[in-house]
């Protein structure tokens, strides 16, 4: 094809591409692909058969934490931190050392705290619609995020030998080997001895966990992992943050599919112990209903941790490829304290529906919000019945986490001209 013909073709495509915007008209997230002859990204609509497990009775895990007959973790000693304790002659010492930023959390069970979570935490890439966060994981943790989620894929269309954090396809967004990101988390945990962090690994290819474990161990993070005494863990089985901190078991790790807690008791099976509201939500009402695991009874759901997915999406279709992208034009509203579609309203609705607040508010671009940046932390504090300090430092916000949609046809023009295309 001649250059003039290519230019004509690209020019003709531009209106078509621009017409692909969907709801929330100001949203302008774009996909930029790299590599040659990339396979078309596909979205799994259902996991493999047998992916969800249920248990008629608890299994005691070998090598797990010591526990009482009631199933609660026991520990010796107190959270003694020198100058961070105050005491009088007539009262017991009073702890003033915060756990996960709040003194009140130290004596609360892990299952009785609402954390702010970063949906697709590793996916930080300016100008790429595969991104879900603006600030890297160290900044996320510094600002108060205590739940991190990321999807694992094998690069090279599944032929790679090192698992990476990738968004649907490693040709869409490749955040690198999993041990790099996990190593950053481990380094942060090293420096913050009074914080408990939860990591949810998405098993994008439904691989056997034995393929991931060596790379998880390579990061050094396993020295901090929490090993539960039972499978599954009910709400009352969880220890307090203070107990976890005293034992140095300050990283809770889940795998969404194909977990094997018999072999790896610390890599916990998510859906036998946690349920989630609808994933990739496109409804601003954010119904607080159980989507995964399917067919979970309300009685069973009330005795599990739960994640409130509050990352609003739109579906973007271009050249036959369907992508879910963040509704960035509504980020401040979605991550706001009050109002239609806000995380604060949704958390309160969940609390009313289930009699307790969500354990995780899972959001995109956590540092956006209203009435101020980082309002998601104030929303979490409200349902935790603690007071958020607005003077806490929080990451700066750039002009926008996206690239304007008018440049999409230019991107595809470059792909066509340079021989990069999607097959």
What are these regions (language model features)?
Residues 2-8, 15-398, 404-422:
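Catalytic cores of phosphodiester-bond hydrolases, prominently lipid phosphodiesterases
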């Amino acid at each position: 094809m001649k250059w003039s013909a290519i230019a004509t073709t690209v020019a003709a495509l531009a209106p078509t591409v621009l017409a692909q915007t969907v709801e929330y008209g100001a949203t302008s997230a774009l996909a930029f692909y790299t590599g040659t002859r990339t396979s078309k990204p596909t979205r799994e609509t259902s996991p493999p058969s047998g992916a969800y497990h249920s248990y008629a009775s608890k299994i005691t895990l070998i090598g797990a934490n010591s526990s009482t007959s009631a199933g609660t973790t026991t520990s010796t000693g107190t959270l003694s931190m020198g100058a961070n304790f105050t005491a009088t002659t007539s009262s017991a010492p009073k702890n003033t050392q915060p756990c996960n930023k709040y003194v009140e959390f130290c004596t609360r069970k892990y299952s009785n705290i609402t954390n702010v979570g970063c949906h697709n935490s590793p996916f930080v890439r300016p100008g790429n619609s595969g991104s879900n966060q603006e600030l890297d994981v160290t900044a996320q943790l510094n600002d108060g995020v205590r739940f991190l989620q990321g999807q694992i894929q094998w690069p090279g269309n599944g032929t790679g030998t090192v698992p990476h954090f990738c968004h649907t396809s490693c040709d869409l967004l490749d955040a690198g080997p999993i041990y790099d990101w996990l190593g950053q988390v481990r380094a942060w945990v090293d420096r913050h001895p009074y914080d408990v962090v939860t990591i949810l690994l998405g098993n994008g290819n439904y691989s056997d966990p034995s393929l991931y474990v060596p790379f998880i161990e390579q990061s050094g993070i396993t020295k901090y992992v929490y090993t539960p005494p039972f499978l599954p863990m009910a709400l009352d089985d969880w220890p307090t943050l203070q107990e976890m901190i005293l034992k140095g078991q300050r990283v809770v790790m889940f795998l969404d599919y194909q977990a094997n807690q018999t072999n790896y008791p610390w890599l916990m099976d998510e859906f036998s112990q946690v349920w989630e509201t609808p994933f990739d939500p496109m409804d601003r009402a954010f119904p607080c209903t159980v989507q995964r695991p399917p067919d979970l009874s309300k009685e069973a759901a009330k005795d599990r941790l739960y994640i409130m997915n509050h990352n609003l999406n739109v579906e973007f279709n271009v050249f036959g490829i369907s992508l879910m992208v963040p509704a960035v034009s509504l980020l401040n509203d979605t991550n706001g304290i009050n109002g239609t579609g806000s995380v604060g309203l949704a958390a309160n609705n969940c609390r009313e529906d289930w009699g307790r607040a969500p354990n995780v508010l899972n959001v995109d671009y956590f540092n956006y919000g209203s009435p101020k940046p980082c309002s998601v932390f104030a929303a979490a504090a409200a349902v935790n019945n603690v007071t958020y300090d607005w003077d806490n430092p929080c990451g700066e916000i750039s002009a926008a986490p996206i690239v304007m949609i008018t440049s999409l046809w230019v991107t595809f023009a470059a792909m066509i001209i340079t021989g990069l295309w999607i097959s």
